Swiss-Prot record:
<dbReference type="GO" id="GO:0020037">
    <property type="term" value="F:heme binding"/>
</dbReference>
<keyword id="KW-0575">Peroxidase</keyword>
<dbReference type="InterPro" id="IPR002016">
    <property type="entry name" value="Haem_peroxidase"/>
</dbReference>
<keyword id="KW-0560">Oxidoreductase</keyword>
<protein>
    <recommendedName>
        <fullName>Catalase-peroxidase</fullName>
        <ecNumber>1.11.1.21</ecNumber>
    </recommendedName>
</protein>
<feature type="cross-link" description="Tryptophyl-tyrosyl-methioninium (Tyr-Met) (with W-96)">
    <location>
        <begin position="218"/>
        <end position="244"/>
    </location>
</feature>
<comment type="similarity">
    <text>Belongs to the peroxidase family. Peroxidase/catalase subfamily.</text>
</comment>
<dbReference type="GO" id="GO:0042744">
    <property type="term" value="P:hydrogen peroxide catabolic process"/>
</dbReference>
<feature type="binding site" description="axial binding residue">
    <location>
        <position position="259"/>
    </location>
    <ligand>
        <name>heme b</name>
    </ligand>
</feature>
<keyword id="KW-0376">Hydrogen peroxide</keyword>
<dbReference type="Pfam" id="PF00141">
    <property type="entry name" value="peroxidase"/>
</dbReference>
<dbReference type="InterPro" id="IPR010255">
    <property type="entry name" value="Haem_peroxidase_sf"/>
</dbReference>
<feature type="cross-link" description="Tryptophyl-tyrosyl-methioninium (Trp-Tyr) (with M-244)">
    <location>
        <begin position="96"/>
        <end position="218"/>
    </location>
</feature>
<dbReference type="GO" id="GO:0070301">
    <property type="term" value="P:cellular response to hydrogen peroxide"/>
</dbReference>
<dbReference type="GO" id="GO:0046872">
    <property type="term" value="F:metal ion binding"/>
</dbReference>
<keyword id="KW-0614">Plasmid</keyword>
<comment type="function">
    <text>Bifunctional enzyme with both catalase and broad-spectrum peroxidase activity.</text>
</comment>
Length: 728
């Protein structure tokens, strides 16, 4: 994969949009950013609120589109000629880099929104000249219009590129709806392209980051920091691919499969390259990296500064990557641009030139390629693939499908005729509903039975919240559907209070078993539904205790996943380090955010707005959900009231840091000094941060009691149903 070094040292922050004064973030750089809760809210969407992409996709003639894409592969354009007469390598890189930003730590990145069109990704050094790939696609996107999103088109084009060169892919699913503004995502602390201040200690990569340098997708192909050491490169590869949820076999298959096609570009010194798209002149119309070296294109193209072609047939699927990797000894050399790369010793020139027929070159490799030979674990896998090409092809097909679909969530979101029938464990499989569901009468009776068990409001609400709040809108993982809270690892997470959780689940499983046994006609309720229903019963009881009658919506249809359908290792990434909604901090885990930052981060993953986050925190506090030691600003715990906001905003209370307790504060009577409450940074941020205080004041008003309950129930229901893609 190309990744240019020509922009090293340049600041990735845009300047020059004047007249412009300092922003609030310029004045107060440590101010909590709640604006991320309101990005892509719809105001920037030109399609309107009634546009249904899934319905538009159903109108798509996929065969006709793929035929047009196949024709494009060999329709070389003078303004950006195709290497070897085929754009396949370019489009594979485009699709790979669209998906390859995915990181398992928080589920962000990936291909699901078409973010490669926007800054900063469209101007990352590692994405150099992919603007040309997207411009080549524009006539096709223009032709098919709303029936295919950019997000889907980028991935489909990668698939068609592979198929047009003789590779059998595993499948393709549509369903990635475009967004219309860049997401504000933490890509690293560096202020310059290719900076690597993200490391500490013995090359410890900071979380949640998944790449080694600012502006790269994974690793530096020249080696760590440009050091051409294959074993050191292997360590970086293993770390970065693991953070994208890939194991060693998938990693080897992806690198070798991707590098079976195309070439890198390093015809001349990177100093010949102009600005990236976001920094270019207006007349360049969003095309960047204009080169003044020779013609600037084709044989004169500069992208990564590396000049490597891996295969004797770079437009055809083969096993040449592994054959070449093990056939030769390799000596370090430099590209015409001065980048470290490797050349085969005592070899014949067998690699075709991309533009001059009959011209041949010596086999070449990247430092990151040699890692697959010299790392002992990778070497074992690589030799197996060398000797078993069918295994390699199958592994690459599966790994490519995983790479390009990892952030799409459950299969119910997949669209189109090429969706594979096989269930894959990384898809977090949930069984299809195979029985009649409970009706309104059943729901009312079950709620009454739940309340008759003696389980407290706190226990019911905490369990339902723990089950549902794992949802991540980023990669559509987690949530209450599947009832995986009863399975490892979730049942043992400290944030879920395992002893209490086991007690509550035991009671609810008993009710579920008794109900199902008493039914005729096959009607059942799943434990996943039972957990959410019990939480609804708890909220209703708490609201009634506060003088408000409310019916919490409940829609059955969740199912229970099995251990065999659950990748426990993969689910470990969903464990909360900090959960501001539950006032929980795991002191045993390394934290990379302040508690209040983690609250907003979690709210964004739950797709909540600022007001929704605010009302949920206030409600969960008085219901004693989660860790009830702090923030319960009420004399009526387990009663759904707006007391949290009333008491937080009370000027009769003065807040001071608690002695010997970092991040904990005491609320004291301003006159007497008597202790009244204890709270955390997450609690106090709703009185400190001006925008959050404005939300809190709405719910702390004398006329807000009913609004508070109504809004809490609506936000609660949103979280409980966040993963119910079957309802969309």
């Amino acid at each position: 994969m190309d990744n240019p070094t020509d922009t090293a040292g340049k600041c990735p922050v845009a300047h020059g949009n004047k007249p412009r004064g300092p922003s609030n973030r310029d004045w107060w750089p440590n101010q909590l950013n709640v604006q991320i809760l309101h990005h892509n809210s719809g105001r920037a969407d030109p399609m309107g609120k009634d546009f249904d992409y899934a319905e538009e996709f159903k109108k798509l003639d996929l065969d006709a589109l793929k035929k047009d894409l196949t024709a494009l592969m060999t329709d070389s354009q003078d303004w950006w000629p195709a290497d070897f007469g085929h754009y396949g390598g370019l489009f594979i890189r485009m699709a790979w880099h669209s998906a390859g930003t995915y990181r398992i730590t928080d589920g962000r990145g990936g291909a699901g929104q078409g973010q490669q069109r926007f800054a900063p990704l469209n101007s990352w050094p590692d994405n150099a000249n992919l603007d040309k790939a997207r411009r080549l696609l524009w006539p096709i996107k223009q032709k098919y219009g709303n029936r295919i999103s950019w997000a889907d088109l980028l991935i489909l084009t990668g698939n068609v590129a592979l198929e047009s060169m003789g590779f059998k892919t595993f499948g393709f699913a549509g369903g990635r709806a475009d967004v219309w503004e860049p997401e504000e995502l933490y890509w690293g602390p560096e202020g310059t392209w290719l900076g690597d201040e993200r490391y500490s200690g013995e090359r410890q990569l900071a979380e949640p980051l998944g790449a080694v340098q600012m502006g790269l997708i994974y690793v530096n192909p020249e080696g760590p920091g440009g050091n051409p050491d294959p074993l050191a490169s292997a360590r970086d590869i293993r770390e970065t691919f693991a953070r994208m949820a890939m194991n060693d076999e998938e990693t080897v298959a992806l690198i070798a499969g991707g590098h079976t096609f195309g070439k890198t570009h390093g015809a001349g010194d990177p100093s010949f390259i102009g600005a990236e798209p976001e920094g270019g002149a207006i007349e360049d119309q969003g095309l960047g990296w204009k080169s003044s070296f020779g013609s600037g294109v084709g044989k004169d193209a500069i992208t990564a500064g590396l000049e490597v072609t891996w295969s004797q047939t770079p437009t055809k699927w083969s096993n040449y990557f592994f054959e070449n990797l093990f056939a030769y000894e390799w000596e370090l050399t430099k590209s015409p641009a001065g980048a470290h790369q490797w050349q085969a010793k005592n070899a014949e020139a067998s690699i075709p030139d991309a533009y001059e027929a009959g011209k041949k070159h010596l086999p070449t490799m990247l430092t990151s390629d040699l890692a697959l030979r010299f790392d002992p674990i990778y070497e074992k896998i690589s030799r197996r693939f060398l000797e078993n090409p069918d295994q390699f092809a199958d592994a690459f097909a599966r790994a490519w499908f995983k790479l390009t679909h990892r952030d799409m969530g459950p299969k119910v979101r997949y669209l189109g005729p090429e969706v594979p029938a096989e269930d894959l464990i990384w898809q977090d499989v949930i069984p299809a509903v195979d029985h009649p569901l409970v009706g309104d009468k059943d729901i009312a009776e079950l709620k009454a039975k739940v309340l008759a068990t003696g389980l407290s409001v706190q226990e019911l609400v905490s369990t339902a919240w723990a089950s549902a709040s794992t949802f991540r809108g980023s990669d559509k993982r987690g949530g209450a559907n599947g009832a995986r809270i009863r399975l490892a690892p979730q049942k043992d997470w400290d944030a879920n209070q395992p002893a209490q959780l086991a007690k509550v689940l035991g009671v609810l499983e008993g009710l579920q078993k008794d109900f199902n046994a008493a039914q005729t006609g096959g009607k059942k309720i799943s434990l996943a539904d039972m957990i959410v229903l019990a939480g609804a019963a708890g909220v209703e009881k708490a609201a009634a205790a506060g003088g408000t009658t409310v019916s919490v919506p409940f829609t059955p249809g969740r199912m229970d996943a099995s251990e065999a359908q659950t990748d426990a290792h993969s689910f470990a990434a969903l464990e909360p380090r900090i959960d501001g909604f539950r006032n929980y901090v795991n002191d045993k885990r390394l934290q990379f955010m302040k508690p209040e930052e983690a609250l907003v981060d979690r709210a964004q993953l739950l797709t909540l707005t600022g007001p929704e986050m605010t009302v949920l925190v206030g409600g969960l506090r008085v219901l004693k959900a989660g860790q009830p030691e702090h923030g319960v600003f009420t004399a009526r715990p387990e009663t759904l009231t707006n007391d949290f906001f009333v008491n937080l905003l009370d000027m009769a209370t003065q807040w001071v840091p608690a002695a010997g307790k970092d991040g904990v504060y005491e609320g004291r009577d301003r006159k007497t000094g008597a202790a009244k409450w204890t709270g955390t940074r997450v609690d106090l941020i709703f009185g400190s941060h001006s925008q959050l205080r404005a939300f809190a004041e709405v719910y702390g008003q004398a006329d807000a009691k009913e609004k508070f309950v109504k809004d809490f129930v609506a936000a609660w229901n949103k979280v409980m149903n966040a993963d119910r893609f079957d309802l969309v």
